[in-house]
Amino acid sequence: MLTLKNLSLTASDAQGRTDIVKNVSLDVEDGKFLVITGPNGGGKTTLAKLIMGLATPTGGQILLDGEDITPLSITDRARRGISYSFQQPPRFKGMKVSDLLTIAAGKTLSHDEACSYLTQVGLCARDYLGRDVDTSLSGGEVKRIEIATLLAKNSRLMIFDEPEAGIDLWSFARLTETVRDLHEKGRHTIIIISHQERIIRLADEIVLLANGEIAGRGTADELYPKLLSQTVAGCNLLEVNGIC
């Protein structure tokens, strides 16, 4: 189980101190699917980065199965099964998809093993294993390949930062199917930062984060009416990419 205890991040500059994440406490049980949503600038991505170790908290603790992992590096957290999917996954010119999967797995993969990871994310293995992870791939393809690397790592906790960003509707539909399938298998804990209703509706629980604090928490049926009733700068919280 992942536990956040009074997790905080305060930034300082010439204008003073800014609380980006404020005393966030949260339990995420193994196998659960949690969506963190809320207005832009509310601290969602920062919270995800704190869990992965991409940012360092100024207060509080992060526990994994009771172990305090707050001081651990990104590498050590990855070894404990935590993985992070960026809004815009990196591309690697000259690196084949098969090579990327092998690196993620930390061992030599058989052809069948590599194929299975791509098949699980809805990609035809024979069309992708030999391709470069470069600009010839669409945003949706790169994101599904990144999810395949998370599977190859045998990640117990997968964190996705706005996976819908920058992809077309067809790719988003396939991505949603992939996430649903992962959750139904029950082998992974999933945390997704998202505004998308279709993703929110799949979650076991939703956390509404605003101004760095938890402003609401519950199931989709419990929290969705609140999400619909709130607006930020005239835009519904669930508008795609915050566009009115």
Which residues does each PLM region occupy?
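Helix-to-loop junction immediately C-terminal to a conserved catalytic motif
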Residues: 52
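Conserved beta-strand-loop-alpha-helix hinge in the C-terminal portion
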Residues: 213-236
